[in-house]
C-alpha cells in the first residue's frame, strides 16, 4: 500500500470518528442534555427497563412529573442512575425530586450526596426518558465488564483495518 492509499484510509477513519462526534454533539444540543443516550446498567428499573436497554433522553421539558423516568447524576459520581420520580416539591423557581427504582424497596435518599434530601431538577437531572431500544446497549456492558471481549473486539477492528485494501 503506497503513502497516498494510507493517507486516504487514515482520512476515512478520521471522517467516521468526526461524523460520530458531530452527530453526538448535535443530538446533545437538540435534547438539551450532555448525555442524550444512556445504557441501563442494573436491574433496579425492572420490569420497565432491563439491563442493556438503551434510553433516549430529552431535557427540554420545563419540569419532571411524578411517574416520569429520569436519569440523574450524583455530584462526585460518574455513573448515571435511571429511576422514576416518586415525589416532587417546588421551591422558589426550583423543582426538587425524590426518586426510586421500580425494583427497589426504598427510595433513593441513601444514594444522594451527603445532606441532600432531593434532586434539583436543574442541576442533577441529565434528562427524562422518552424512548428506548431493548437490549441493544448490552455490547457496552460487555465492553466495560469483560476485558477479554474488549481486547478481542479491538484486535478484530485493528486486523480489519490492516487487511482492508481500500
Swiss-Prot record:
It comes from Clavispora lusitaniae (strain ATCC 42720) (Yeast). Component of the signal peptidase complex (SPC) composed of a catalytic subunit SEC11 and three accessory subunits SPC1, SPC2 and SPC3. The complex induces a local thinning of the ER membrane which is used to measure the length of the signal peptide (SP) h-region of protein substrates. This ensures the selectivity of the complex towards h-regions shorter than 18-20 amino acids. SPC associates with the translocon complex. Disulfide bonds: none annotated. The gene is SEC11. It catalyses: Cleavage of hydrophobic, N-terminal signal or leader sequences from secreted and periplasmic proteins. The active site is at 44 (charge relay system), 83 (charge relay system), 108 (charge relay system). The chain crosses the membrane at residues 10-31. Its main location: endoplasmic reticulum. It is found in: Endoplasmic reticulum membrane. GO terms for molecular function: serine-type endopeptidase activity. Residues 32-166 are lumenal. Keywords: Endoplasmic reticulum, Hydrolase, Membrane, Protease, Signal-anchor, Transmembrane, Transmembrane helix. The lineage of its organism: Eukaryota, Fungi, Dikarya, Ascomycota, Saccharomycotina. This is Signal peptidase complex catalytic subunit SEC11. GO terms for cellular component: signal peptidase complex. Its EC number is 3.4.21.89. Coiled coil: none annotated. CDD domains: S26_SPase_I. GO terms for biological process: protein targeting to ER; signal peptide processing. The C-terminal short (CTS) helix is essential for catalytic activity. It may be accommodated as a transmembrane helix in the thinned membrane environment of the complex, similarly to the signal peptide in the complex substrates.
